[in-house]
């Protein structure tokens, strides 16, 4: 069965992709999502400011889960110098969508 689809000009093998969040919070998790078969990979949101995340920040029960993190707890430098290159080296060509910032400053610095 062909599940391929187009998303904003990208051709995906299937329409499944993770949301920006804890499941894609570093290069190891990005690779895990690729290996799990996602059609595209989305990073955890990267900001110009490090997040200070109070713990616990994830709550759930049998019917739902809530996450209160705003963006990555890692610096933009760690993403640019470590996580993204590590993922790209292991990627098989599937699209990588980088979630960046919340502010005008974030956009100016990160894009």
Where are these regions (language model features)?
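Active-site entrance/lid segments in N-terminal catalytic domains of soluble metabolic enzymes
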Residues: 2-8, 12, 17, 22, ...
């Amino acid at each position: 069965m062909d599940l391929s689809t187009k998303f904003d000009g990208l051709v995906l093998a299937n329409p499944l992709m993770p949301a920006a969040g804890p499941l894609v919070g570093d290069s190891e998790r990005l690779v895990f999502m690729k290996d799990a078969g996602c059609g595209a990979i989305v990073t955890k949101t990267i900001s110009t400011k490090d997040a200070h995340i109070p713990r616990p920040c994830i709550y759930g029960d049998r019917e739902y889960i809530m996450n209160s993190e705003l963006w990555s707890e890692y610096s933009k430098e760690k993403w640019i110098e470590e996580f993204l290159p590590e993922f790209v080296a292991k990627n098989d060509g599937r699209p990588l969508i980088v979630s960046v910032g919340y502010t005008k400053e974030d956009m100016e610095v990160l894009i």
